[in-house]
UniProtKB/Swiss-Prot annotation:
Its EC number is 2.7.11.1. One of its GO terms (molecular function) is ATP binding. GO terms for cellular component: autophagosome; cytosol; phagophore assembly site membrane. Homodimer. Forms a ternary complex with ATG13 and ATG17. InterPro entries: Atg1-like, ATG1-like_MIT2, Atg1-like_tMIT, Kinase-like_dom_sf, Prot_kinase_dom, Protein_kinase_ATP_BS, Ser/Thr_kinase_AS. It comes from the Eukaryota. It is a peripheral membrane protein. Residues 373-387, 477-489, 563-579, 887-896 have a biased composition (Basic and acidic residues). Serine/threonine protein kinase involved in the cytoplasm to vacuole transport (Cvt) and found to be essential in autophagy, where it is required for the formation of autophagosomes. Involved in the clearance of protein aggregates which cannot be efficiently cleared by the proteasome. Required for selective autophagic degradation of the nucleus (nucleophagy) as well as for mitophagy which contributes to regulate mitochondrial quantity and quality by eliminating the mitochondria to a basal level to fulfill cellular energy requirements and preventing excess ROS production. Residues 343-489, 524-586, 795-817, 878-900 are annotated as: Disordered. This is Serine/threonine-protein kinase atg1. It comes from Aspergillus niger (strain ATCC MYA-4892 / CBS 513.88 / FGSC A1513). The active site is at residue 174.
Amino acid sequence: MGLFHHSTLFLPLLRRSNEGPHGEMPIGHYTRLSEIGRGSFAVVYKGVHTRSRTYVAIKSVTMTKLSRKLKENLASEISILKQLHHPHIVALLDCHDTTSNIHLVMEFCALGDLSHFIKGRNTLQDSPYTRELIAKYPNPGEGAGLNEVIVRHFLKQLSSALRFLRDRDLIHRDIKPQNLLLCPAPSSYRSGAADVVPFKSSEDSFSPKTGLESLPMLKLADFGFARSLPATSLAETLCGSPLYMAPEILRYEKYDAKADLWSVGTVLYEMVVGRAPFRAVNHIELIKKIEQNKDQISFPSKNRVSEDIRELIRGLLKQHPMDRMNFDVYFAHKVLTEPIPGLVADDAPLGRSPADPTPRPGSGSRRSTPVQMKRENALSGGVRDEPATYPAAQRAMTQSPRPETPSTPMRRTGSAGTPHAAPNEPTPPASHPTRPSPVSLATAPGRQEHVDRPPTTTVVEQQRRRTASSGVPQVDKPVEKAKDEKEHAAQEVAFERDYVLVEKRAVEMNAFADELAYNPRMQGGQAGAVSRRSGAAPGTPPAGGSSPHASPSKAMQIISGRSRADSAHVRQNSYDRRYGQSPTSATSAISKALNMASGRLFGMSFSPPLTITKGGRSPPLAYNPFPAYPSAQTSLIVHADGGKPGANLDEDSKTVHDLEECATRSDVVYGFAEVKYKQLIPLAPSAATGYPGDPGSDAVDSADGGLTVDAIVTLSEEALVLYVKALSLLAKSMDIARVWWTRKSRGDTLSRADTGSTVAGNRINNVVQWVRNRFNEVLEKAEFVRLKLVEAQKRLPSDHPSHPSNLSVGSSLGSGTSADVVVSPDVTAEKLMYERALEMSRVAAINEITGEDLAGCEISYVTAIRMLEAILDDVEVSRPGQSGGADRADARRDNEDGGQNEPQAVILAKSANAWHSDIENPESPGVAPEEAGAAVESVHAPVQWTGQNAAVESGASLPCSGSHAAEIRTLTVRSMQDHAHFAPLLFSIFISSYSSSISCPSSCGHC
């Protein structure tokens, strides 16, 4: 979860301007100096060897903040690093324990990481440390990343480290540019050009095994997720950084060491092109993009990289491991084995083979020397001998302000993007800070006596001619640029957490969804079945009743404000199954109106006149509603005799009903949580304008949208509890499906030619896939909100009620990560949902009386009903075979007892739910409407009905004056007379809005 993120922390010149230098602190043979990076669990400092005055990086981990899993990862990292001694792997120099901290002393990599080197490639010529490099090997230009010579150099060194790991059956599992650290060229140490001289654990610590000594040296870092995995074994833990994660890991499948090769392919592509091959807002969308790409790796038209590199990238970026090249083929590829082409005359390759194999552990390596003994003594606490000597060089430390960045968990403390040349005069640590030097060289202060070598013009001219003769027109594409900006902004938010760790529950849910999706018995006749992790198969026309613009879910679409085409999916099936369609029933007309309204329930036309904090909507316009798959209009619940859902339902239909009801409730809660989430995240650059008329669409003033710390805490708490509630409902939905599937698997009943059972199975499978995708999405967002909350709480004054020290443990939310999340005692999902339901209904009722936005009134009423049903979900657990009458009887008994032991919100919702069910089924005894009204009479001020009461009594507002209208009028008048205030209007007022727009269902001749 960000603890083991070294690469972004080796940038000592990039300090916050409001942070003072930390006091020096002795740690063994080292002195800890200024802080250079901070994460959720660790702080990284610059350090210096006390005797030699050479530099190290010291990572101080606070053990009290770590969960058991993170402690295991830390112990694993220490254990692995103690065994790894290779020039292209960051070495662990020493380890010191205290009562509350572990201090890891690591090799210092002065040039930062490869990510910032790539991002700052256009400013490298401004630094004396890379000026010569860029003069010899200039950047190819637009549509490209680094010069191919530099790309091949870094790839050879990375491959050398990977071969070393493979010889020891180790997989890294988190290879990415941020974990590839760079050191100044080894030749710069010999010439005395490098100011920041790192501590050397051995003679060859900074002597490359392959590549060029005149170019920066690459080292693989961050072994927090590494593990031993023999060639015949498979792993199944999802961990690492999503953007560079292999598809098999994203799909929660077992994987082997080939997962590292995919990551190498993504890194190689980014070095060549300047961006990752697949970019998405979260790991769910990422796997969709990878699968939709179908191994067709394309390159920008202006990119002139060689065909050998393209072939290697395409061989590495195969989404199926069986199709991906193996390690033997990879290590034997000519890009790694042949000399680097295009070198200048004075950059002769090293004498070693470019892919110099490293010996196996027992084959007598270079480490069987006194140096190794010294290293082992140091790791065990012994006194370290003096390191290998360097040429005399002026060693001075310069402190530079780190640009202010949004407060985010385990963020990268890299360059602000526009680096400047280092100062001419070195200054002591206490001097005034200077501006940051170039991105990749942020930790290296400038040297006054730096010697510039004359640039070689041959390669420069060759590169320019190659670019000029490419024949590609230099056409600006503002549309693509804007799209990239929005995608990048969304990506920065989504990947603010550097790692994804999925708990066991999520893995189980995804495994069950996969089992159901790929079971042969579920495949036959599956109309409109979803593809893996998709809303609908690409190019598949939606079934009747679905939006023709269906598209896969965008988990964080709301960031950029783009319209969600798939949010227009109708929800008729959800209500067809609940309400009968008998032409002889008054309630069937009401259900028909509900069905008509449900099509707009979460569509783009949603416009209830509602506001919340900062003007958010509930639900927001742009999120993926349930169901997110094309579905036919046929209802499994409606029988030929027009009967209603009841005891006569078969098990399949009852399961479908319960499953879709639970999923729909989770969707409503999710929509409410999205309102809070939307206010916590910054908009993309091109989405500064919100929806028309939305009070919350003001320009964002800062990364937090101009929110105060108090507001961030409040919104984070509310979003978190709502997301947790949505997760519980989604988990319950999956449990319902799992019980059904277990029963079906035992009985093998799906194998028979039963049309109803097959349709039910397909429908359940569709819902399960939707639930799986939504669960993964909500889990991702809940973790983001959790980190946001934890960080915001720490920024509060110590006497603030929401400060962690002032919150009791009893109000904590269990967290499977580092520590419990503590929320304010008065923030609960049920309270928020109850108040929101009343608010929506109250405003809708006023609009209904005045005749404004009747369609929005219907939507608000139905949404509020679902929200109250979600509150009741923990009380009335719906299981297959359980009758609805028992639930209503329980609700009535609770009300008759006066609800002594239950909150008033639950009493009201129970009464309302039972009475609402009685309206659907008038033949069954129900709760009188006045019982529901009495529950809130003492809380809500009455608002008297005016002319509409008389209008309804006389039938003037009803389009049907026949017997059906009379039945509807009877129900409506009874409810309106018994409910003279709007609090219980969910169960009375909405009927009148439907009655004003209902057409006769049976053409009685009076309409």
